[in-house]
Amino acid sequence: MSVCTTAPSATAPDIIRQRGQRTVFCGLTGIVWLHRRIQDAFFLVVGSRTCAHLVQSAAGVMIFAEPRFATAIIEERDLAGRADLDDELDRVVTRLIERRPDIKLLFLVGSCPSEVIKLDLTRAAARLDERFGRLPRILAYSGSGIETTFTEGEDACLEALVPTLADAGSTTSLMVVGAVADIVEDQFRRLFTAIGIERVDFLPARHAGAMPAVGPHTKFILAQPFLAATARALHERGARRIAAPYPLGAEGTRLWIEAAAAAFGIDPARTESVLALPARRATESLAAVRAKLAGRKIFFFPDSQLEIPLARFLARECGVELVEVGTPFLHRDLMDAELALLPFATQLSEGQDVERQLDRCRAEQPDLVICGLGLANPLEAEGIATKWSIELVFSPIHGFEQAADLANLFARPLARRALLSV
């Protein structure tokens, strides 16, 4: 176990780096929002019964509803070597494709059990993809929780998609990277069109056949901060990233769109004229919620990699006092624009040593703690209001029109705690 602190400077707040006991969900939870986003994709987890229970309970979907995800259970006979796992997987995939001809994109999703037994799903996916003539397209990625966070499931999924994207050639385009709700995509598309960016694509697209092309004339901007591997893969295809804060809250959304506009040489006056009204509406809608949050102390446990953009939004637009902002990984190249907007000397922590972080949290007695489900109930029992960080990934929180909804996600636990204390 090691702890080190980076000295403060004009550009970087103190950072506590810790490695110890962790409490996290695995990347399989990403299937919940990814299968809603890509509407003709199927996610086949190769794992244990525990994996199956996790995904089904997180999605809240009954098996008889025939959802677009399932689990190929690794049984004891598989672990004992009495069955050929490749043959078993081929049989399951063949049966699935015969039963669900509507599937256009099939992901084989690795898990902790499949990684422990060294099952090579990437090779299996390539073999099956060729066998079925790419109808459907078959890819693989890891949703394992071994040394990862739950949002890395989306990163791994999109990273697997990037090599399959068509070559854009000389076409100039903007690619928005990261799964967002359909309503958010529609809002962003209208705004980008209004400011004069003609070609806007989203990764992932709503349908497998609509995935964007990529090439040297592609500029991409991240909608989610946890997509480091996807960003690297896009760079390898020749695309260039537009650095910007993330589109959370009125300020973040405005700066995000302005960064894209500047990268495409759009007249700032035109951008301002398009954004003025939605930005003003968002700010006005935030006013009532700000009154409930201003002056409240909030502590972030590291869980989703959304912590720093959320902290920026809460501090600058809601008047919240940041006690500590923990994040599983601090990718400075993806976070520089956000770090510059945080209040000076905001206490950041990278990595997790849960016992030490709990000690710091209890000592500060914050009004609200943002954490994973495993910590929420014990903290609630101690009288500390909590917000599940995973809800912030499941909910539409990006863009101007969702700014007040995002703030309300933090205000509601405080209101509930106040009612319970009466």
From Swiss-Prot:
Its cofactor is [4Fe-4S] cluster. Binds 1 [4Fe-4S] cluster per heterodimer. The cluster is bound at the heterodimer interface by residues from both subunits. Keywords: 4Fe-4S, ATP-binding, Bacteriochlorophyll biosynthesis, Chlorophyll biosynthesis, Iron, Iron-sulfur, Metal-binding, Nucleotide-binding, Oxidoreductase, Photosynthesis. It comes from the Bacteria. Its EC number is 1.3.7.7. InterPro entries: LIPOR_BchN/ChlN, Nase/OxRdtase_comp1, Protochl_reductN. It catalyses: chlorophyllide a + oxidized 2[4Fe-4S]-[ferredoxin] + 2 ADP + 2 phosphate = protochlorophyllide a + reduced 2[4Fe-4S]-[ferredoxin] + 2 ATP + 2 H2O. It is an enzyme of class 1 (oxidoreductase). The keyword Heme does not apply. GO terms for biological process: light-independent bacteriochlorophyll biosynthetic process; photosynthesis, dark reaction. One of its GO terms (molecular function) is ATP binding. [4Fe-4S] cluster binds at residues 26, 51, 112. Belongs to the BchN/ChlN family. Protochlorophyllide reductase is composed of three subunits; BchL, BchN and BchB. Forms a heterotetramer of two BchB and two BchN subunits. HAMAP family: ChlN_BchN (MF_00352). Component of the dark-operative protochlorophyllide reductase (DPOR) that uses Mg-ATP and reduced ferredoxin to reduce ring D of protochlorophyllide (Pchlide) to form chlorophyllide a (Chlide). This reaction is light-independent. The NB-protein (BchN-BchB) is the catalytic component of the complex. This is Light-independent protochlorophyllide reductase subunit N. It comes from Acidiphilium rubrum. The gene is bchN.
